[in-house]
Swiss-Prot record:
Name of the protein in its database record: Isocyanide synthase B
Species this protein is from: Aspergillus fumigatus (strain ATCC MYA-4609 / CBS 101355 / FGSC A1100 / Af293) (Neosartorya fumigata)
Entry's transmembrane regions: none
Family that this chain belongs to: Belongs to the isocyanide synthase family.
PANTHER family recorded: SPORE WALL MATURATION PROTEIN DIT1
Keywords recorded for this protein, A-Z: Oxidoreductase
Function: Isocyanide synthase involved in the biosynthesis of isocyanides (or isonitriles), a class of microbial secondary metabolites. The presence of an isonitrile moiety within a compound imparts unique biological (cytotoxic, antibacterial, and antiprotozoal) and chemical (transition metal coordination) properties and enables synthetic and biochemical applications.
GO MF term list: oxidoreductase activity
Positions of disulphide bridges: none
Mitochondrion keyword on record: no
UniProt xrefs under InterPro entries: Isocyanide_synthase_DIT1
Superkingdom of origin organism: Eukaryota
Keyword hit for Hydrolase: no
Length: 546
């Protein structure tokens, strides 16, 4: 049995950041043969800060999307390092900014579940939050991602009302507040132009004022002499964005085109016109963001070669090729093959049936309605099977909630094992811990094999197949994991991917390993390659014997 002991560093209050000074990157340190003690200490501090800056940059870069023409190492990284040097020298939080989260696609039939944020938005917000959390593990001031909602720039072009844009943003705020995502901040054009004191607080006020603000934004911040066709021919990033917009518009406006029985040529022309308008408006919006926040790490959810800004993935387990997949254009679902939540157009046209589910926040997602998800299926207790709830966890894994006191013997253990091969770890809530017996453990090992483990927690006692050891201190504050049946040199390597990933993310400690309580159990398949894109040098694995 292993214990993962974590020390949480308190967050530091954000202060006003001064403008970024010009750095002379050509300078080199030169030292006399004999250094005074204070000079030597200063040199050591500078070297330590430089190493810290490199580690922070490595964390941020691990979220990027790397296309075939990626120029991060050559072009963007030197600028990123200069910005991070300033933050570290001032002991300021790392400020990252991303314009994103406009509104849900208007194509509710084929692309999204509805107009409100769902589990896709939740997972992506937790993903952005993990950037700041990981930075804080090595740099106490931490970091935060400021999301600047850009919905007002484009909603009228896609037939989405101002009221719907406001409600979508409010839903995002509720997710962040309820999950306590302390490394996420929000901003919008009202905040950036008129100040936080003048931001609309009601849907009616927002709808009555947004038109005038948009006119001012596009009039005042549109670049002088901007020529779209010239930029498209010279800037590969503009061409990528343009193609990406057309790609989304073809599906976002599919119902609009169908109702008007538009020809293919008319559809292409309409999408091109709208995409041009979106890019022109986006230029003005980017200029506003740059002016309002002159010192920041600029993130982007659009494809690019990573020269002027850093293109990032919105989910942890896939880079999604060149084009990021966004939750506001897609449906979140659990299937039979992916190791984590997937995002795509509604998966309702294939052979696999899906059912609508919701997490503990009431956010929706789809779940494959297949035997492996029917972990309780007893003819004499049909109501019990209906009460089983599945909830995807960030960045991987699954929580299964059952009515409190449910005997573990009611589970179809072969289906639990099959599910664990896709979603690992699985955390069960609500089980009766006294029902976990050696016979059940033997049954699970028989159907699952030696590479899987099932652990359950009694009050202060972790029970496995053959051992029961008292946990020192508070059981609720302990993090631990069952070691597989292998011993010696074969045991530890099987667990290293899980332990490394679990120790690396603040969110994992709270939401995947969870605060275990009586009645919670964990099933893990140690063969699963966990979907966390962490480089080895960024991992901090803390463990000890229980």
């Amino acid at each position: 049995m292993l214990s993962n002991t974590i020390t949480i560093v308190p967050s530091i209050e954000t202060r006003v950041v001064e403008p970024l000074p010009q750095f002379d990157t050509s300078r080199r340190l030169s030292f006399p043969v004999s250094l005074p003690l204070d000079s030597l200490a200063g040199a050591r501090k500078k070297a330590a800060n430089e190493a810290l800056v490199e580690r922070i940059a490595e964390i941020i870069a691990s979220y990027r999307i790397s296309g075939p023409d990626d120029r991060y190492e050559v072009v963007y990284k030197p600028k990123l390092l200069d910005t991070l040097r300033y933050f570290v020298s001032k002991q300021e939080p790392v400020n990252m900014v991303v314009p994103a989260y406009p509104f849900k696609s208007p194509n509710r039939d084929e692309k999204v579940l509805g107009p409100d944020p769902d589990v896709g938005e939740r997972m992506s917000l937790e993903h952005f939050n993990s950037m700041g959390a990981r930075i804080q593990q090595i740099y106490p001031p931490g970091g935060y991602v400021t999301i600047v909602s850009d919905g007002c720039c484009y909603n009228d072009l896609l037939g989405v009302s101002d009221e719907e844009v406001f409600r979508y943003a409010e839903g995002l705020h509720r997710i962040v507040d309820r999950l306590g995502l302390k490394h996420i901040k929000f901003s919008d054009p009202f905040d950036l132009i008129e100040g936080r004191h003048n931001v609309p607080v009601t849907e009616e006020e927002y709808a009555s004022r947004i038109g005038e603000l948009k006119d001012y934004l596009f009039r005042s911040y549109h670049p002088d002499g901007y020529d779209f066709d010239e930029e498209l021919s010279k800037d590969p990033n503009a061409a990528l964005t343009y193609r990406g917009y057309i790609r989304f518009l073809m599906s976002d406006l599919a119902l609009f085109f169908k109702e008007r029985q538009m020809s293919k040529n008319a559809i292409k022309k309409h999408c091109s016109t709208v995409a041009r308008s979106m890019i022109k408006r986006g230029k003005a919006f980017s200029a506003l963001v740059a002016r309002a926040s002159p010192l920041h790490v600029r993130l982007s959810i659009h494809a690019s070669d990573n020269t002027g800004k850093l293109s990032v993935a919105l989910l942890p387990h896939k880079r999604y090729s060149t084009f990021p997949v966004t939750p506001w254009h897609n449906t979140p679902y659990l299937d039979t093959t992916s190791v984590s939540l997937s995002l795509s157009r509604k998966p309702t046209d294939g052979a696999t049936p899906y059912r609508l589910c919701q997490d503990e926040l009431g956010l929706h997602f789809l779940c494959a309605d297949v035997p492996m998800y029917r972990v309780i299926e007893t003819p004499d207790l049909p109501a019990l099977a209906q009460q089983v709830q599945f909830q995807p966890l960030y960045p991987f894994g699954l929580r299964i909630k059952v009515p409190r006191g449910t005997p573990i013997g009611q589970f179809r253990l072969e289906r639990v094992a099959e599910l664990a091969k896709v979603h690992s770890p699985i955390i069960f809530e609500g089980l009766d811990p006294m029902e976990y017996t050696a016979a059940i453990a033997d049954d699970f090992q028989r159907v699952a094999g030696g590479t899987m483990s099932l652990s359950i927690l009694h009050e202060g006692v972790a029970t496995t197949a053959n051992t029961a050891r008292h946990l020192g201190g508070s059981a609720a504050a302990s993090y631990f994991l069952q070691i597989s049946a292998a011993t010696g040199d074969d045991a530890q390597p099987a667990l290293l991917p899980f332990l490394a990933a679990a120790a690396a993310l603040d969110d994992v400690r709270y939401r995947v390993l969870h605060h275990w309580q009586a009645g919670h159990a964990v099933v893990s398949d140690h063969r699963v390659a966990l979907p966390v894109h962490l480089s080895p040098s960024s991992l901090r694995v803390l463990h000890g014997g229980v």
